[in-house]
């Protein structure tokens, strides 16, 4: 099967410089969500109908995607016609879908396709029952057979009473679709070519059926930032519900933002106002407290993180972090490390049991087991041109307000006096102090 994804619309009501389909619905571009859903059907080629600022869509999807261009906006039928060169010699099925319905479920598309195949139909439309169907195309049927779809502006009073509406998703046999597209015209109030006219053309001598959705929210389109927020909320609720059903504790799901790819182990508690993004994994029995943001990181079991930011890092069992710590990319905290308030790490490994309680920067560093980093310690890793590494051994005590000017090595079991500026390697089992002599001048202030 091939698909045709309608993604050429300007999205005027979005009031944005971006094409509508690249806006993020719960952290992922809408067009990516549509393609992800279609991949469930083992689609051999997704053909995108692009128009307004198509280069922005290609930036998201890559230039190797299959697409055609609709230069003029002359209706949905005109859009699909642009894809005829890509399907005219194809003998399979073609699925047509709007690019702005990110709530469509994978299982819905599977059931939709299976009904089409089981009924040996020539075409099928996805429909839904709306109590207030205003503005939607109405599905006109004779028993189970679909006769036509009538747009709101073209419908008579009797047709407007029909509550079954067109959801904008179709499957047709490719050759039947191509022949029908050649017959559609723009003799209607809007002067546009409607893809829905294909239904009436095919129904004259072929079998066209419908599949009615149980959850009409799946076809919620996005035409404004308000509707974008609505679908994002639904997607967030789906993710949070699935996590809770798997044993995760969400104190307040309404204020918890967790991307689709995030994995969380059972009995982990997520507090309000937490954001978990990208390919983040969190183990079991951990606590992620309010104000925390974790991106593309792996968090093990029994970890406690409070009001901190963690990016592209690894946090092993029993670690405590925060409040107000920042783990920048390539930080690796091993078992039972403690990182306190206003501590920043970057491209550093802290071995088992290391403690850095407060006001510290550890960049391009390796710190051995059970070392204590005093308040105000800074690894001076950058000379204005290059980055250098600081190596600190195990069981080291770094006094407060110490500057470690890289490259520098501190040996095991060493002690660095508070206020020191260390520029030379310190051997193991040593005391190193580097600071000016304290001078006292009595009676200085008269």
Swiss-Prot record:
<keyword id="KW-0460">Magnesium</keyword>
<feature type="binding site">
    <location>
        <position position="223"/>
    </location>
    <ligand>
        <name>UDP-N-acetyl-alpha-D-glucosamine</name>
    </ligand>
</feature>
<dbReference type="InterPro" id="IPR005882">
    <property type="entry name" value="Bifunctional_GlmU"/>
</dbReference>
<dbReference type="GO" id="GO:0009252">
    <property type="term" value="P:peptidoglycan biosynthetic process"/>
</dbReference>
<comment type="pathway">
    <text>Nucleotide-sugar biosynthesis; UDP-N-acetyl-alpha-D-glucosamine biosynthesis; N-acetyl-alpha-D-glucosamine 1-phosphate from alpha-D-glucosamine 6-phosphate (route II): step 2/2.</text>
</comment>
<dbReference type="GO" id="GO:0005737">
    <property type="term" value="C:cytoplasm"/>
</dbReference>
<feature type="region of interest" description="N-acetyltransferase">
    <location>
        <begin position="247"/>
        <end position="446"/>
    </location>
</feature>
<keyword id="KW-0133">Cell shape</keyword>
<dbReference type="InterPro" id="IPR018357">
    <property type="entry name" value="Hexapep_transf_CS"/>
</dbReference>
<feature type="region of interest" description="Linker">
    <location>
        <begin position="226"/>
        <end position="246"/>
    </location>
</feature>
<dbReference type="GO" id="GO:0016020">
    <property type="term" value="C:membrane"/>
</dbReference>
<feature type="binding site">
    <location>
        <position position="328"/>
    </location>
    <ligand>
        <name>UDP-N-acetyl-alpha-D-glucosamine</name>
    </ligand>
</feature>
<comment type="pathway">
    <text>Nucleotide-sugar biosynthesis; UDP-N-acetyl-alpha-D-glucosamine biosynthesis; UDP-N-acetyl-alpha-D-glucosamine from N-acetyl-alpha-D-glucosamine 1-phosphate: step 1/1.</text>
</comment>
<feature type="binding site">
    <location>
        <position position="151"/>
    </location>
    <ligand>
        <name>UDP-N-acetyl-alpha-D-glucosamine</name>
    </ligand>
</feature>
<dbReference type="GO" id="GO:0009245">
    <property type="term" value="P:lipid A biosynthetic process"/>
</dbReference>
<feature type="binding site">
    <location>
        <begin position="75"/>
        <end position="76"/>
    </location>
    <ligand>
        <name>UDP-N-acetyl-alpha-D-glucosamine</name>
    </ligand>
</feature>
<keyword id="KW-0963">Cytoplasm</keyword>
<keyword id="KW-0808">Transferase</keyword>
<feature type="binding site">
    <location>
        <position position="400"/>
    </location>
    <ligand>
        <name>acetyl-CoA</name>
    </ligand>
</feature>
<dbReference type="InterPro" id="IPR001451">
    <property type="entry name" value="Hexapep"/>
</dbReference>
<feature type="binding site">
    <location>
        <position position="372"/>
    </location>
    <ligand>
        <name>UDP-N-acetyl-alpha-D-glucosamine</name>
    </ligand>
</feature>
<dbReference type="GO" id="GO:0000287">
    <property type="term" value="F:magnesium ion binding"/>
</dbReference>
<dbReference type="GO" id="GO:0071555">
    <property type="term" value="P:cell wall organization"/>
</dbReference>
<feature type="binding site">
    <location>
        <begin position="381"/>
        <end position="382"/>
    </location>
    <ligand>
        <name>acetyl-CoA</name>
    </ligand>
</feature>
<feature type="binding site">
    <location>
        <position position="20"/>
    </location>
    <ligand>
        <name>UDP-N-acetyl-alpha-D-glucosamine</name>
    </ligand>
</feature>
<feature type="binding site">
    <location>
        <position position="375"/>
    </location>
    <ligand>
        <name>acetyl-CoA</name>
    </ligand>
</feature>
<dbReference type="GO" id="GO:0019134">
    <property type="term" value="F:glucosamine-1-phosphate N-acetyltransferase activity"/>
</dbReference>
<feature type="binding site">
    <location>
        <position position="223"/>
    </location>
    <ligand>
        <name>Mg(2+)</name>
    </ligand>
</feature>
<dbReference type="InterPro" id="IPR038009">
    <property type="entry name" value="GlmU_C_LbH"/>
</dbReference>
<feature type="binding site">
    <location>
        <position position="361"/>
    </location>
    <ligand>
        <name>UDP-N-acetyl-alpha-D-glucosamine</name>
    </ligand>
</feature>
<protein>
    <recommendedName>
        <fullName>Bifunctional protein GlmU</fullName>
        <ecNumber>2.7.7.23</ecNumber>
        <ecNumber>2.3.1.157</ecNumber>
    </recommendedName>
</protein>
<feature type="binding site">
    <location>
        <position position="70"/>
    </location>
    <ligand>
        <name>UDP-N-acetyl-alpha-D-glucosamine</name>
    </ligand>
</feature>
<keyword id="KW-0573">Peptidoglycan synthesis</keyword>
<keyword id="KW-0511">Multifunctional enzyme</keyword>
<comment type="subunit">
    <text>Homotrimer.</text>
</comment>
<dbReference type="Pfam" id="PF00483">
    <property type="entry name" value="NTP_transferase"/>
</dbReference>
<keyword id="KW-0961">Cell wall biogenesis/degradation</keyword>
<comment type="function">
    <text>Catalyzes the last two sequential reactions in the de novo biosynthetic pathway for UDP-N-acetylglucosamine (UDP-GlcNAc). The C-terminal domain catalyzes the transfer of acetyl group from acetyl coenzyme A to glucosamine-1-phosphate (GlcN-1-P) to produce N-acetylglucosamine-1-phosphate (GlcNAc-1-P), which is converted into UDP-GlcNAc by the transfer of uridine 5-monophosphate (from uridine 5-triphosphate), a reaction catalyzed by the N-terminal domain.</text>
</comment>
<feature type="active site" description="Proton acceptor">
    <location>
        <position position="358"/>
    </location>
</feature>
<keyword id="KW-0677">Repeat</keyword>
<keyword id="KW-0012">Acyltransferase</keyword>
<keyword id="KW-0548">Nucleotidyltransferase</keyword>
């Amino acid at each position: 099967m091939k698909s045709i994804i309608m993604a050429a619309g300007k999205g005027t009501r979005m009031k944005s410089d971006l094409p509508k389909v690249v806006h993020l619905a719960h952290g992922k571009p809408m067009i990516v969500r549509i393609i992800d859903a279609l991949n469930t059907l083992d689609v051999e080629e997704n053909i995108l109908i692009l128009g307004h600022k198509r280069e922005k869509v290609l930036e998201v999807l890559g230039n190797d995607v299959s697409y055609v261009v609709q230069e003029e906006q002359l209706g949905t039928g005109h859009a699909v016609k642009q894809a005829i060169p890509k399907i005219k010699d194809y003998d399979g099925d073609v699925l047509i879908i709007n690019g702005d319905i990110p709530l469509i479920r994978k299982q819905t598309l599977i059931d939709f396709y299976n009904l089409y195949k089981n009924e040996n139909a020539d075409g099928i439309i996805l429909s839904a029952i709306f109590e207030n169907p205003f503005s939607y195309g109405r599905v006109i049927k004779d028993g189970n057979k679909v006769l036509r779809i009538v747009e709101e502006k073209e419908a008579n009073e009797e047709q407007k009473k029909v509550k079954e509406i067109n959801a904008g998703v179709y499957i047709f046999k490719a050759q039947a679709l191509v022949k029908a597209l050649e017959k559609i015209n723009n003799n209607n109030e809007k002067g546009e070519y409607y893809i829905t006219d294909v239904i009436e053309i095919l129904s004259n001598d072929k079998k066209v059926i419908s599949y009615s959705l149980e959850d009409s929210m799946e076809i919620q389109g996005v035409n404004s930032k308000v509707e974008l927020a609505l679908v994002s909320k639904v997607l967030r609720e789906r993710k949070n519900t699935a996590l809770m059903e798997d044993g995760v504790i969400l104190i307040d799901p309404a204020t918890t933002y967790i991307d689709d790819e995030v994995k969380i182990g059972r009995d982990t508690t997520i507090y309000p106002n937490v954001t978990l993004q990208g390919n983040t994994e969190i183990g079991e029995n951990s606590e992620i407290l309010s104000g925390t943001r974790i991106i593309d990181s792996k968090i093990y079991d029994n970890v406690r993180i409070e009001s901190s930011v963690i990016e592209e890092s690894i946090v092993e069992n029993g670690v405590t972090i925060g409040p107000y710590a920042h783990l920048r990319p390539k930080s690796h905290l091993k078992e039972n490390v403690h990182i306190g308030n206003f501590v920043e790490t970057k491209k550093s490994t802290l071995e088992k049991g290391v403690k850095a309680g407060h006001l510290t920067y550890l960049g391009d560093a390796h710190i051995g087991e059970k070392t204590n980093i005093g308040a105000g310690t800074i690894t001076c890793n950058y000379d204005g041109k290059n980055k250098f590494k600081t190596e600190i051994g195990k069981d080291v005590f770094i006094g407060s307000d110490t500057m470690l000017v890289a490259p520098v090595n501190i040996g095991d079991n060493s002690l660095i006096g508070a206020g020191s500026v260390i520029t030379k390697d310190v051997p193991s089992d040593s005391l190193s102090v580097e600071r000016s002599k304290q001078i006292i001048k009595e009676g200085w202030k008269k």
